[in-house]
Amino acid sequence: MSSARRPSKLLSEKQSDKLAQIIQNFFLKAAHVIFHFRVAFPSVVLQPDDSYGAMGDTFSQSKYNNRWFNLDLGNYEIPRTELSLWRNKDILSLPPLVLETFLDLRGLSSNQTLMLDDVIVKTSKKSEIVLERWLIEFDLSTFDNEVMEFPSIYKKIIILFRSLYLLAGLLPSYRLRDKLVKSKSKNSAIHVSCRILDGSKPITSKGRIGLSKKLLSEEEHTSSKKLQPVLTPIGALRVSVSYRTNCNFQVSDTEEALSSQFMLDHLPSVRTNYDSDGNSLTSPMDYLQNRVSSASIHWSDQSPRRRSSTRSVQLFKVGSINSSSSPPPGATQSNQSVSSFSTSKPIPVTLNKTNSSASLVPILRQNKDSLPKSIGSMVQNQMQETGHQVSSNSRRFSSSFGSRFRTVSSRNNSLDGQLVVANQPFSTPSNNPILHNFRSRNKSPSVSSTELGPSSSIYMDDDLDSFMKMLDSKPDLRFPSNSPSVYEDPLANFKTFQKSNDFLALEQQQHGSPTSNQIMIHSQSQTSQSQVFKRTVFSDRSRRGSVSSNYSPSSQALRPGASAPMVTPSVTYGKFHASSGSPSNSSLAQYLRHNSSPPASATAVATVHNSLRRLTSSSQRTNTNSTNSSTRPVNPELLKLKSFNEDVFESDDDEHDEHSPRSTDTKSRNTGPSSGHAEDDEDDLLFAMSDMTLAKNNQEF
């Protein structure tokens, strides 16, 4: 069971953490399974005495179910204070966990009597009767260094818990608990409860009836079982139980019990039965067994020839499977006298009878030869002392799965189900290098992994653990000073970009500024003359700085890389306050001023005015008949167009040189009474026609 040779590799830190979680949750889950079968829900709240604490309805309801080892027992959990030793201590120093199941007698009144199989049990000055004790321990002396696969260990523990779940529901104490829960009396005077004890400390029986004390005259009143241990690289996980075989307790009134006992003692037909040795038979089972055994002895005396082949048959077979087999040919008469298949009387079992039950841990750790736990094991020990070999018969009924250990061992298939290992070499924990490596890491989990969510497993804390280690390994972040040196280079690049894209930045500001009632109307005319007209209007309005008309032509961003700035043929119809100029006009005026010198811009504006006047005169000649024949009322916007035209051309004439021939010509035309009025009328007519065309296009758009 233990490997003394040096392992091929040691446990890593991550593997050590997982193994520590498995071992810790093994203790907690085993306690949960036992309490699940022993404590009724709901149960009576017990008041613990000074020595021990009793647990009744002290289970708390958790938010999630503990699904460790593929076993879901509901959302009830044991209080943390009861399992504090096994939650926060070091894995290698975990004490054995003892769970004690007892029958509480504190509810018995003076007129009530406790009876066991129609026999009165003396419970004076006793408050409890111990029914069973479970021992859960982590044995460091037994290990297997070659078992390094933790999923395999986890699956073996799953099988162990299934066996524990089945065994806990088959023991007599569970049947007693089930009977008391299903009884009609809600306020029962007795009930089953559990407590948790530290197995490293002695267990006394002061003020209660211990597990080793007999309540009837039966020879063997206790039994024990051990489950298959699970080996790990640093130790073995073990579960064992010692229990009372008879738990048929019941409560009756004292007067009824005494009257029934008095009537049985004074009936003439009732007589005391004795066996062949003169011992009184108090129970019907003893009387029936005595009759069967006496009949078999009488038959063997009448047939001396068949004495060698005749054997007695008990009513209930007690012992191992080996006891029902035929005797070995080399067995002597003395061996037959002590074997279970050649005697008709029960074999006495020597037990350590003391006034107070000793600690369970030393008893279970004693040598199996010194303290037999069942009849089958005692018979095997007696045969070994006389030189009889029973290994061949025991192997006859061995498991078909073979030995699960690496050492030579034999399995005893007796009734108590003990695991008897012969010729087993034990190694001390000092010979285990993996254990030393595990101890050097000083594993002491402060938070149990059972506190995780419903999908709790051994891989749940890996992310959090790695994150905390990453935080510890990384140095503290140091922020630089408040000097703006970090931002100097990006700011310089941004300024360079802004200079090269000045017009684009202005257009972004134009789109970002809010405008009211802005409607974009695309003109169908794409001639160069209309473009020149719009450019002239933009330049004039930018120079004035204020807008007196509701017409606000807008511009569109120029494409970078073009040889000449092209303006999209569109007119913006909007309303602006007189105090604030049009954003589009101002931006375009700034662009024109930026790209042209003042003398050149003045000359260009004069040229635009001349071409505009030629266009106006030609349009007036072609549309004279249509305008004269039109009887429609004058559009109200005509006055606005007139004022707009006058303001534009007057402001332009003021800015030009007074000595220029074109300017003097314009002044003479404006000062002439007849010619000035005629030209103004032509201009008004042209703008009125443009306004009607724009309104029509606006409706179509």
Curated annotation (Swiss-Prot):
Entry-linked InterPro entries: ATG13 (IPR040182), Atg13_N (IPR018731), HORMA_dom_sf (IPR036570)
Originating organism: Pichia angusta
Polar residues composition bias: residue spans: 521-533, 545-557
Gene3D superfamilies: 6.10.140.1900, HORMA domain
One of the record's GO cellular component terms: phagophore assembly site
Similarity comment: Belongs to the ATG13 family. Fungi subfamily.
Domain of life per record: Eukaryota
Residue stretches of biased makeup (Low complexity): 332-343, 596-632
Name the record gives this protein: Autophagy-related protein 13
Record's compositionally biased regions (Basic and acidic residues): 657-668
Pfam families, per database record: ATG13 (PF10033)
